[in-house]
Structures are given as C-alpha cells and as structure tokens.
C-alpha cells in the first residue's frame, strides 16, 4: 500500500514538473497579437483541460508502474518519460523562445510519442492506455492550432521575430 502511494506521488510529481514549464512560459502580449483561427479555444479552457489531462497522465503512469515488471512496461515508461520532455519543451519553444515552427516540429514528435505510448500502454494496462487518449486528442488539437498559427503568421517577416 505504501509503495503504491509513493508511486502515485512520484507520478504526480513528474507530471507537475512537466506542467511547471507551462506555468513558467505562458501566453503574453506576443501571443495575444498573433493571428489565430476562429476555432481557437478560449484562454480559460487551457488550464482546465491541462489540469485534467495531467491528472489522467499521472494515473496512467502510476498504473504502469504498479504493473508486473516486463519489457512492455519498461518500454512504456521510457516512452512516457520521453513524451514528458517533448511536452515540456513545447511551452518553452512556443511561448519562451517564440519559435512557432520549431514548436510545431516538437508537437508533431510529441503526438507521435503519445500514440506510441498508448499502443505500448495497451500491452500492460488497458485502463492506462485509455487514460492517455484524451491527452492525445487534445495534443492533436494543439498541433492543428500550432500549425494554423504558424501558417497565419509566417510570411515575408517571420512571426517568430515579432
């Protein structure tokens, strides 16, 4: 029981560290001035969605960690950690460095890692895999948003230099 609780706390801590980059690199006047599609979610949707998604991710990782040791479990956890890094990098690239195109590359990699993670998770815990699906869907939306913002703001003068 204590081991399970510690594993859950560690999982929440890892997700919290990832989330902290989103808290550190947030939308500012640069972002507000960018041209965005009409279907951009309202600002309030982002912290609500990410709060829920990060909790689901932490529970999924905890379920994996508590599963019997196997090659699938090890691979699942490795890909999970990789996608956490890609997730954290996106906020830094997009909001911190204002590099829309590079952030777009990162989010493509992130979505690929999430899809791989879901496939691997399903070999260990069906529940853990399903807990990652909303995250994958939200990141797919974020990818489309990132790509559209890049398209709307690129041109003779790079939007990343505004």
Language-model-derived ranges and their functions:
Residues 2-24:
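N-terminal signal-anchor transmembrane alpha helix
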Residues 25-42, 149-162:
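Cytosolic, membrane-interface loops and tails of multi-pass inner-membrane proteins
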Residues 34-52, 93-94:
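Membrane interfacial helix-start motif at the N-side
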Residues 43-55, 99-110:
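Membrane-interface loop-to-helix entry segments
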Residues 94-99, 115-130:
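Membrane-helix boundary connector in multi-pass membrane proteins
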């Amino acid at each position: 029981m204590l081991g399970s609780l510690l594993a859950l706390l560690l999982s929440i801590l890892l997700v919290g560290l990832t989330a902290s980059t989103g808290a550190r690199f947030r939308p500012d006047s640069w972002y507000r001035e960018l041209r965005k599609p009409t279907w951009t979610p309202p600002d309030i949707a982002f912290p609500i969605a990410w709060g829920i998604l990060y909790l689901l991710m932490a529970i999924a990782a905890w379920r994996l960690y508590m599963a019997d040791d196997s090659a699938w479990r090890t691979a699942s956890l490795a890909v999970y950690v990789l996608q956490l890094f890609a997730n954290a990098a996106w906020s830094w690239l997009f909001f911190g460095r204002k590099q829309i195109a590079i952030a777009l590359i990162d989010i493509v990699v992130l979505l690929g890692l999430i899809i791989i993670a879901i496939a691997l998770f399903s070999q260990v815990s069906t529940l853990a895999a399903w807990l990652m699906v909303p995250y994958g869907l939200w990141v797919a939306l974020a990818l489309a948003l990132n790509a559209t913002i890049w398209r709307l703001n690129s041109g003779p003068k790079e939007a990343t230099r505004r």
